Amino acid sequence: MKNVLPPFIEIYRALIATPSISATEESLDQSNASLITLLAGWFSDLGFNVEVQPVPGTRNKFNMLASTGHGAGGLLLTGHTDTVPFDDGRWTRDPFTLTEHDNKLYGLGTADMKGFFAFILDALRDVDVTKLKKPLYILATADEETSMAGARYFSETTALRPDCAIIGEPTSLQPIRAHKGHISNVVRVLGQSGHSSDPARGVNAIELMHDAIGHIMQLRDSLKARYHYEAFTVPYPTLNLGHIHGGDASNRICACCELHMDIRPLPGMTLNDLNGLLNDALAPVSERWPGRLTVAELHPPIPGYECPPDHQLVEVVEKLLGTKTDVVNYCTEAPFMQTLCPTLVLGPGSINQAHQPDEYLETRFIKPTRELITQVVHHFCWH
C-alpha cells in the first residue's frame, strides 16, 4: 500500500495547490475539506485509521485524526491545515503552485505550515506502522490562523492522552517549549451626540475614552513592573493599543468611540485574572459614567503555554538536535495540546517567512526534518 504514495515533492505540490485560506471576512474564508480529503487518503494508504471531525462554529471546516498502534501514551504529531489570505499584488509567483528556485520551495503554506504534513508522510512511508509498540497520532486542525477553533474543539472533546506532542510550526528546527498568550478586546464608550456649540447638551465619547486610555496605560506599566519571565526577549506582558475610532464630524459631539487593544500574557497568567485586572483598571471610568463603558472580546483568547523543562520530551529533542529549547513571543495551538500532554513546537522553515509574500521554505530543512521525525517516532513509539 505504501508504494502508492506520491514522491515527497509531489505531496508537497498537491498540498500547496489545494487552497485552504482562513479569514474572519467571509468572502475570503475557505473550507479545508479538499485538503483534509487528500491527507486522509494518504494516511489511510499508510495503514492509519482515519477520522474526520467537523468543527462546530466554522464555515465547513474539519479536523483529521490519523491513528495507528494500541495502548496508552504514544506520540502526537500535529499541525494546522489553513493558511492566511494572500496579497496578490505583492506575490511574484502563483501562491498555489509549488516553485523551486535557488534552494527554496515557494508557495502559500510551504513554511506555515501545510508542508509539515509532506515531511510526516515522507518519513513514514518506509515504516511498518503495524509493528509500533505505542500509538502514533497525526492531527490536522482547522482555523488556526483565525480562531484556533480546530485545536480548541479537539482538545475539549478527545479522550486521547499521548505521552507527548510536537506541533510542526516553522521554528527553523529550534525546539520551543513556551510562548506568550493573546487576549484581544474592544473597549467601547457610548456618549451622547449633540451640536459642538453646546458641549453641556452631550457626552463626548472621545473625552471619556481619553480618560479610559490613561487608566489602561497605568495597567500596562503595572504589568511590566509586576510580571517577569527573563527567558523571553520581551520579558514582561505587553499591552498594545492597536486601533481607535470615534465620531463622524468636527462639529458634532462624539457619540461613540471604540478602542481595539491586545495583551500578551506570560505563561502561568490566567485569562480570568487578566480580564479582572483590565476591569479593575477601568472601574473609575465606569463608576463616573455608569453604563457608558463596556469591554468585549474581539477574538477568542489564547492562554500562555509552557512545557516543563525537565520533561522527557524536552530532554530527548534537545539531545537529538544538539540544542536547547527556547521560548517565543508569538502564539500557536500549543496551549490546547498541552492540556492533553507535554507539547513542544518544532518544525522546518522560518517564522520570518510566515504570512509574507513569496513565502518559502529552504530546502536545507528537508533532510534534517525527515530524520528528526523518524527519530522521535522511533523513540516514543518503538521503545
From Swiss-Prot:
For this UniProt record, the keywords arranged alphabetically read as follows:
Amino-acid biosynthesis, Arginine biosynthesis, Cobalt, Cytoplasm, Hydrolase, Metal-binding, Zinc
Keyword Transport annotated: no
Name used for this protein in its record? Acetylornithine deacetylase
Source taxonomy: Bacteria, Pseudomonadati, Pseudomonadota, Gammaproteobacteria, Enterobacterales
Similarity section: Belongs to the peptidase M20A family. ArgE subfamily.
Cited function: Catalyzes the hydrolysis of the amide bond of N(2)-acetylated L-amino acids. Cleaves the acetyl group from N-acetyl-L-ornithine to form L-ornithine, an intermediate in L-arginine biosynthesis pathway, and a branchpoint in the synthesis of polyamines.
* Gene Ontology terms for molecular function: acetylornithine deacetylase activity; zinc ion binding
The enzyme's first-digit EC class, named in words, is hydrolase
Highest taxon listed in the record's lineage:
Bacteria
Q: What is its EC number?
A: 3.5.1.16
User: Which residues does the Swiss-Prot or TrEMBL record annotate as the active site?
Assistant: D82, E144
Q: Is Cytoplasm one of the keywords?
A: yes
Q: Which HAMAP family match?
A: ArgE
The free-text cofactor remark is: Binds 2 Zn(2+) or Co(2+) ions per subunit.
